[in-house]
């Protein structure tokens, strides 16, 4: 739900900036491809992060944000590169702009490129503010208790 909200807000900001070389469904002027791509992409990164989050549960917020960004940025670059170079999905509305040097992807104005890299951290901060809990924390805690019990019996 949070990822969908962030995606929808982004689409309000960049609404006219999406016009692809493929005919994706558009409703009320909103291209559904980037709307769903952002929501699904943010959700996937969040699921990966939440799986490992119990390992650094007691770490400072800035450490957790750094871990999230370390996941989000490479995934963003990978997906954008594959979409552009392999699937040839091109945004005609921003095709005149130079892509990022290291991947020749995200052909858009600089403010859009920066926004792409900031959307993930903003999403993470929103999730942190509303205190979104990992469904994996309880499972991790149970596994850790089981392992600790097993090893404590060996030491006796």
Regions found by a protein language model. Give the residues of each.
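Aromatic-rich, lipid-facing transmembrane alpha helices and their immediate juxtamembrane interface loops
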Residues: 1-156
């Amino acid at each position: 739900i949070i990822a969908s909200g962030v995606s929808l807000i982004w689409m309000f900001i960049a609404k006219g900036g999406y016009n692809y070389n493929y005919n994706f469904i558009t409703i009320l002027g909103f291209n559904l491809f980037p709307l769903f791509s952002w929501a699904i992409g943010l959700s996937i990164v969040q699921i990966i992060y939440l799986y490992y989050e119990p390992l650094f549960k007691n770490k400072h917020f800035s450490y957790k944000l750094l871990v999230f960004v370390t996941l989000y940025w490479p995934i963003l670059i990978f997906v954008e590169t594959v979409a552009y170079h392999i699937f040839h999905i091109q945004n005609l509305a921003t095709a005149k702009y130079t892509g990022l040097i290291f991947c020749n992807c995200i052909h858009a104005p600089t403010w859009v490129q920066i926004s792409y890299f900031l959307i993930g951290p903003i999403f993470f901060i929103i999730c942190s503010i509303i205190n979104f809990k990992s469904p994996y924390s309880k499972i991790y805690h149970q596994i850790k208790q089981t392992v600790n019990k097993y090893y404590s019996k060996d030491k006796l």
